[in-house]
């Protein structure tokens, strides 16, 4: 059974389908320290990035944020739909990431809009 403090420390999970949604949420916060990646199978490198993001956020009095994808950018871009190539299911990934003391987790749907967005413009959405 979860304790009230455990419930309060769980991250807010956002499902994003358009970059404008992401930008709107980011604008509503006082500041974010972010890490971005697919995070399929949370290995030691991922753990380091997540923990460093949390540490930097605390030091800068920001919210900590992890941005991942609800679907595989690789599979989207190559048109391969092989669900057996994942190390963890979406459910497992969400559960694993929820154990970190990160404030917000964004799962962005990798779609044509994201695929056609230049890297600079993508960063503009994050730095609004």
PLM segments and residue spans:
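Nucleotidyltransferase catalytic core that binds NTPs
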Residues: 1-128
């Amino acid at each position: 059974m979860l304790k009230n403090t455990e419930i309060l420390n769980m991250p807010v999970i956002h499902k994003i389908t358009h970059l404008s949604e992401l930008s709107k949420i980011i604008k509503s916060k006082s500041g974010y320290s972010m890490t971005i990646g697919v995070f399929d199978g949370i290995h030691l490198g991922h753990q380091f990035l997540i923990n460093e993001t949390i540490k930097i956020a605390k030091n800068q009095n920001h919210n900590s944020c992890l941005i991942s994808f609800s679907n595989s950018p690789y599979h989207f871009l190559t048109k391969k739909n092989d669900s057996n190539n994942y190390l963890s299911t979406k459910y497992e990934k969400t559960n694993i990431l929820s154990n970190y003391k990160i404030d917000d987790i964004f799962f962005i749907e990798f779609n044509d809009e994201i695929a056609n967005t230049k890297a600079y413009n993508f960063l503009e959405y994050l730095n609004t």
